[in-house]
Amino acid sequence: MGSAGSKKRSERQQGLREKLLRVPERPYGRLSGERREQSSRSPGESDKDLNSPSCEGQNARGAEGGGQQDADESDEDDEVGAICKTPIVPLRPMTYKLAVDMSHFIKEQGGLEGMYYSERRHRILDTYFENEEGIVSGWQNYTHGPGIRYPKYFGWLWKLVPVEVPAATREEEETHCLMHPAQISSWDDIHGETLIWQFDSLLAYDYVAFNRFPEEFGYQSGLPEEEWKARLKARGIPTD
């Protein structure tokens, strides 16, 4: 029974991965393996030291013709809603254990590592977790930035890491890949940074978001209201 359940879950996870990668219309959307390996070898370095992303699959069929425009127009209905129409399990809140387990499961299935972050993919993840796992959305939040964005939910082991895309690379990718996710990612970010997901197992033990940026948790930070609001203001973050 357990084996069959794991197989079905793996199949659903593969469906999520395909949605995130927008297969087959655009067969790209993550940092290439070589550059992802180079980035992972320098976890302590600043975001400016990370290597720039390359355009995967730029010569594949999704980069030719007008398939991309059609995919964009049906984005909301086809990518977000089509994962599952209604929840298949009872709804429940996210917990630390669930977050850790799901983080590792996604990593084992090759889901998010090196993939460009965007609001659209954020929504796809929310929809998947709610409909397939019954986890109520609203837990997937990250620190404000700029720089590395740490998950604000303790137990979620995927952080967002900025990568640099040189102007020459942007022009080349726009020519060969139409609208590459690297461009979309920077549009979605208030600081204009291009972000990728990166797995960090140490986040299961170190609540980095809270320890470094307690002001972002507002009244839950334990700080006096005047202090956490002053910290947010100094960083240019709205306090309303």
From Swiss-Prot:
Motif PxxP, chain ranges: 87-90
Organism domain of life: Viruses
A Pfam cross-reference name: F-protein
Entry text on domains: The N-terminal domain is composed of the N-myristoyl glycine and of a cluster of positively charged amino acids. It is required for inner plasma membrane targeting of Nef and virion incorporation, and thereby for infectivity.
UniProt-listed SUPFAM superfamilies: Regulatory factor Nef (SSF55671)
GO CC term (a single one): membrane
Protein name per Swiss-Prot or TrEMBL: Protein Nef
Localisation: Host cell membrane
Biased amino acid composition, Basic and acidic residues: 11-50
